[in-house]
């Protein structure tokens, strides 16, 4: 049930009847304060200006045409022309019943699209670090939300599995007689990578051999391809352990590494030349873009093939976008890549559009994000100043959560405690990130994220168990409740019901904007409203059975909404804490 969309269409029709143009926008918003109703229509100012009339006058005319019978109990004009809409308690009660009768809590499915989501993208032969966390979990929230809404989602893990580093690694492995790479752990490869880079920089003979190995690898030599495949396999096996720990939905089948697009690159360069988009410049092949200027104010040159015939990331990203449209048949492509890559992506996509590889009707969206910072406001590092490995971060989260959970549950069985600690610890790390606007940097703080107060995973998980405890005390099951009516008489009942029915609107925003913090804010607000409702509207000691059962149903929908909302974030819920 999308009340916002329903009201938007009703108010828009009334605006048109009052003389507004057919493309007018009512600007229906959830009201910030209860005295302004449940929703506000804020679009009168902009439309009235076009019509040359006072906004309040337009609002008055709109009200004469606005039929919200059975939806709103009161509609009033406020200030210069805002229209405040108060939802009818009977309308709320009816739709709470409908939501409870639905496995999807009444959430509709929009027109199905094929959506490619590019996220995580670790590098081969390197362990995942904290810099991969944001892309991985924000992207996974988008995937979960879009799939719940009924879209066909293709996960694209754009793994860095190609380039000169493989010449270095294979040459060094060979030198160290470690050709059976399949038996090695990724931690060994990290050391090998550092040693290989050191030798590459300091030993010209070794560097030359590494460059030759890259050529052999790229030419398809089976020995070198097999070594490369082993390196990829070790890396992705290790990464899968991290994905499973993080409770994200990526699997090995979702890997679409840079190497996938290699066969396309020569044809793309030739095609861009044939279309007059790419030209030779100082030995390289370059596309000059008017949309981007260099320091002299001239069109910026984007290299797609180097003098030595090598290709660049831009060339791969052009091929990647083309593949996602032509082969995967994407209607929309979302990229969860950090903000530092924005100009690079914009340049690649400008070339993609000019070449006609992806039509303008198919959105290519960079859902960029900021950095994770330490308490000092600088990029999050180890005490020694090194990069924090993601596995180490999750280990520490689990250890801290174990201590926290054991302190609160001294007699809990060990296996149950471990399961609870895992849900709390991993959930805390994820929620702390997801609850922040993805476009901003944020401070990583263990104490805040593991707190049982505020907008945190432990608080949300506890809020869920608190609602469940009401049912345990009531000793009533869902089947017994099903036939009971929902009756809304108290203000706090109405406020909770209205917020519960805004779940679909929240999902729609997350799906459109890729903003998990909107879902976190909604769930936190919902938990707070339930707390106020529970305090002021007795459930188990209600004045009669009808009121008791009605309030139990509001509690029931609250529990289901919290669980489903947290599930879209990949946050595990628990029955007891």
From Swiss-Prot:
Q: Where is the protein localized?
A: Cytoplasm
Q: What EC number(s) would the UniProt record show? A: 6.1.1.19
Keyword Ribosomal protein assigned to the entry: answer is: no
Record GO cellular component, one term: cytoplasm
- Which GO BP annotation is one of this protein's? arginyl-tRNA aminoacylation
Q: Which PROSITE patterns match?
A: AA_TRNA_LIGASE_I
Its organism's taxonomic lineage begins at: Bacteria, Pseudomonadati, Pseudomonadota, Gammaproteobacteria, Enterobacterales
* Gene Ontology molecular-function annotations: arginine-tRNA ligase activity; ATP binding
UniProt lists the family membership as follows:
Belongs to the class-I aminoacyl-tRNA synthetase family.
Q: Which reaction does it catalyse?
A: tRNA(Arg) + L-arginine + ATP = L-arginyl-tRNA(Arg) + AMP + diphosphate
**What superkingdom does the record give?**
Bacteria
**Know the name of this protein?**
Arginine--tRNA ligase
Report the SUPFAM superfamilies cross-referenced here.
Anticodon-binding domain of a subclass of class I aminoacyl-tRNA synthetases, Arginyl-tRNA synthetase (ArgRS), N-terminal 'additional' domain, Nucleotidylyl transferase
On subunit structure and binding partners, the annotation says: Monomer.
Q: Which InterPro entries match?
A: aa-tRNA-synth_I_CS, Arg-tRNA-ligase, Arg-tRNA-synth_N, Arg-tRNA-synth_N_sf, ArgRS_core, DALR_anticod-bd, Rossmann-like_a/b/a_fold, tRNAsynth_Ia_anticodon-bd
Q: Which keywords has UniProt assigned to this entry?
A: Aminoacyl-tRNA synthetase, ATP-binding, Cytoplasm, Ligase, Nucleotide-binding, Protein biosynthesis
């Amino acid at each position: 049930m999308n009340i916002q969309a329903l009201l938007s269409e009703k108010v828009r029709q009334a605006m048109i009847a009052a003389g507004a143009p057919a493309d007018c926008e009512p600007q229906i918003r959830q009201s910030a304060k209860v005295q302004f109703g449940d929703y506000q229509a804020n679009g009168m100012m902009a439309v009235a200006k076009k019509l040359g009339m006072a906004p309040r006058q337009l609002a008055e005319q709109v009200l004469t045409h606005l039929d919200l019978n059975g939806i709103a109990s009161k509609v009033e004009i406020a200030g210069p022309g805002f229209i405040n809409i108060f939802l009818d308690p009977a309308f709320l009660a009816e739709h709470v019943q409908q939501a409870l009768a639905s496995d999807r809590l009444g959430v509709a499915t929009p027109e199905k699209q094929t959506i490619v989501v590019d996220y995580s993208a670790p590098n081969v032969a390197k362990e995942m670090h904290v810099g991969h966390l944001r892309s991985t979990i924000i992207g996974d929230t988008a995937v979960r939300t879009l799939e719940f809404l009924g879209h066909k989602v293709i996960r694209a893990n754009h793994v860095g599995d190609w380039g000169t580093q493989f010449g270095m690694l294979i040459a060094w492995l060979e030198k160290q007689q470690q050709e059976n790479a399949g038996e090695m752990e990724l931690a060994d490869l990290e050391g090998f990578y550092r040693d290989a880079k050191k030798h590459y920089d300091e030993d010209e003979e070794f560097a030359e051999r590494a460059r030759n190995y890259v050529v052999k690898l790229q030419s398809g030599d089976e020995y070198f391809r097999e070594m490369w495949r082993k390196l990829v396999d070790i890396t992705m096996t290790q990464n899968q352990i991290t994905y499973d720990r993080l409770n994200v939905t990526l699997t090995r089948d979702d890997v679409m590494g840079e190497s996938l697009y290699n066969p396309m690159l020569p044809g793309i360069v030739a095609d861009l030349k044939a279309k007059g988009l790419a030209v030779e410049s100082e030995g390289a092949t370059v596309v000059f873009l008017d949309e981007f200027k260099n320091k002299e104010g001239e069109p910026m040159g984007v290299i797609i093939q180097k003098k030595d015939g090598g290709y660049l990331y831009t060339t791969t990203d052009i091929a990647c976008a083309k593949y996602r449209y032509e082969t995967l048949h994407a209607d929309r492509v979302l990229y969860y890549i950090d903000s530092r890559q924005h100009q690079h992506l914009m340049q690649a996509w400008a070339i993609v559009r000019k070449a006609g590889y992806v039509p303008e009707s198919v959105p290519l969206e960079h859902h960029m994000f900021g950095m994770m910072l330490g308490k000092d406001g600088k990029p999050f590092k180890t005490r020694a100043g090194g990069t924090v490995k993601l596995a180490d971060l999750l280990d520490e989260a689990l250890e801290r959560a174990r201590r926290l959970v054991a302190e609160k549950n001294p007699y809990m069985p060990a296996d149950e405690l471990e399961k609870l600690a895992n849900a709390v610890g991993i959930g805390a790390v994820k929620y702390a990130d997801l609850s922040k606007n993805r476009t901003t940097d944020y401070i990583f703080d263990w104490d805040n994220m593991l707190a049982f107060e505020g907008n945190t995973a432990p608080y949300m998980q506890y809020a869920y168990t608190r609602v469940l405890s009401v049912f345990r005390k009531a000793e009533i099951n869902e089947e017994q409740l099903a036939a009971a009516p929902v009756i809304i008489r108290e203000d706090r009942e109405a406020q909770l019901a209205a917020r519960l029915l805004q779940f679909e609107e929240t999902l729609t925003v997350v799906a459109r904007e890729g903003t998990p913090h909107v879902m976190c804010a909604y769930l936190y607000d919902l938990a707070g409203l339930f707390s106020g409702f529970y305090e002021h509207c007795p459930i188990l000691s209600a004045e009669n059975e009808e009121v008791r059962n009605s309030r139990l149903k509001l509690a029931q929908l609250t529990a289901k909404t919290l669980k489903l909302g947290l599930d879209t974030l990949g946050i595990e819920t628990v029955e007891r804490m």
